[in-house]
């Protein structure tokens, strides 16, 4: 059995930390229509630099949405 190439493993790890990986899980277990267990999880693997970059971009998007919502005129009341 051949050993995995350690340089390729290092390249994969470098790419995962550079780009980041998100695993989003949602599962519900029910028995006879009765919910027994619900699992919600989000796992993020990335370098701190990558995380901070994307967190900054997400904050900009959220701020733009809040600003757009505040500037939207209120609907006229119905008569």
Curated annotation (Swiss-Prot):
CC annotations in GO: gas vesicle shell; vesicle membrane
UniProt cross-references to Pfam families, sorted A to Z: Gas_vesicle (PF00741)
Compartments, as annotated in UniProt: Gas vesicle shell
Region (Beta-strand 2): 35-43
Region (Beta-strand 1): 23-31
Keyword line: Gas vesicle, Plasmid
One function term, GO molecular function aspect: structural molecule activity
NCBIfam families named among the record's database cross-references: halo_gas_GvpA, PRK09371.1
Known partners and oligomeric status: The gas vesicle shell is 2 nm thick and consists of a single layer of this protein. It forms helical ribs nearly perpendicular to the long axis of the vesicle.
Name by which UniProt lists this protein: Gas vesicle protein A2
Recorded name of the encoding gene: gvpA2
């Amino acid at each position: 059995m051949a050993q995995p190439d350690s340089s390729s493993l290092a390249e994969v790890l470098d790419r995962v930390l550079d780009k980041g990986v998100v695993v989003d899980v949602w599962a519900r277990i029910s028995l006879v229509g009765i919910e027994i267990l619900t699992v919600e999880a989000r796992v993020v693997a990335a370098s701190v630099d990558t995380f901070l970059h994307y967190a900054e971009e997400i904050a900009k998007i959220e701020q733009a949405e809040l600003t757009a919502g505040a500037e939207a005129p209120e609907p006229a009341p119905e008569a």
